Swiss-Prot record:
Disruption phenotype: Cells lacking this gene form dendritic (branched) swarms more slowly and arrest prematurely on B-medium. Swarms normally on LB medium. The keyword Transcription does not apply. The gene is yvzB. It comes from the Bacteria. Its main location: other. This is Putative flagellin YvzB. The keyword Cell division does not apply. Coiled coil: none annotated. Belongs to the bacterial flagellin family. It is found in: Bacterial flagellum. The lineage of its organism: Bacteria, Bacillati, Bacillota, Bacilli, Bacillales.
Length: 160
């Protein structure tokens, strides 16, 4: 039983993410996540201590029922299991909320990208049509100017 209690404490002390211990109860303010674009859109997750002391199983002794009756020790184990189950249920609810938030943010990101694309991207067919429409008068003007410049040359050649 001592080995199991040590393992519970070991898991409680070793479980960490990003340098922060998750299950030892030291993060009393919880873990805060930014889940939206605005400043107030945050989610705080509190994780209770899962150490053997916090769970109430650190003093179990399954070989000595004289000082602590078997029923009392069994109740301690049941209470610890219930505490762990309750914490897992809370974390599962938070996980569902985060997954929902991830899906919403993904849809928002896709919509924002599509809107930006509509603003930035050019309708090539329309723009080529506009270019051609504007280019025809310009080319016609250049051709007329070239012909007008040619006429004095033709007159000079006739006079020679």
């Amino acid at each position: 039983m001592d080995a199991l209690i040590e393992e519970v404490d070991g898991i409680s002390n070793r479980t960490e993410f990003n340098g922060k211990k998750l299950l030892d109860g030291t993060e009393t303010d919880g873990f805060t996540f930014q889940i939206g674009a605005n400043a107030g859109q945050q989610l705080t997750v509190n994780i209770d201590s899962m150490s053997s002391t916090a769970l109430g199983v650190n003093a179990l002794n399954v070989t000595d029922f004289a000082n602590t009756p078997f029923d009392t020790q069994l109740e301690s184990i049941d209470t610890a299991i219930n505490n762990v189950s309750n914490q897992r249920a809370k974390l599962g609810a938070v996980q569902n909320r985060l997954e929902h938030t991830i899906n919403n943010l993904g849809a928002s990101s896709e919509n924002l990208t599509a809107a930006e694309s509509r603003i930035r991207d050019v309708d090539m067919a329309k723009e080529m049509s506009e270019f051609t429409k504007n280019n025809i008068p310009s080319q016609a003007s250049q051709a007329m100017l070239a012909q007008a410049n040619q006429q004095p040359q033709n007159v000079l050649q006739l006079l020679r």
